From Swiss-Prot:
It comes from Saccharolobus solfataricus (strain ATCC 35092 / DSM 1617 / JCM 11322 / P2) (Sulfolobus solfataricus). Signal peptide: none annotated. This is UPF0310 protein SSO2595. The lineage of its organism: Archaea, Thermoproteota, Thermoprotei, Sulfolobales, Sulfolobaceae. Belongs to the UPF0310 family. Coiled coil: none annotated. NCBIfam families: PRK00809.1.
Amino acid sequence: MTYWLVPIQEDMWDVIRDKGIYGYKENLEEFIKEGDYIIIYVSKYYAKRYGGKIVGIVKVLSNWYEDQTPIYPEETVRNKGIYIYRVKVEPVVIGECDMKKILDKIRFIEDKGQIAKYLRNAPANLKRPIPESDAKIVEECLKESLLNI
């Protein structure tokens, strides 16, 4: 069981959650495989609600495939596929976990003074998997957020 962190733009979350498809502009099959888990982090850029938060953990249900069909908001505006390398996913847990809330508990962000370098690109964390112990902390944070609704 391998966990990966990926940053997304906020408007991609609805598609990932509702259609069960995660896409990226490059093929990530070297890293993320069927059966792995993706921790979805919403970057702060242009975010209105979820910026700086982890919004879910999804399980990868397929191998990577290429699909040019525009499904994400940025793609539909341009009428062109951008995040054309895709995998089918299903939510394991959905919620809102503010990174600041768990920063002192997680190990994968080794340099707390340079948090951003661990939260960019895909997969994030400098292209390294997330330790399972950190994934469990994230999962608990997401579940706690559901209790506070």
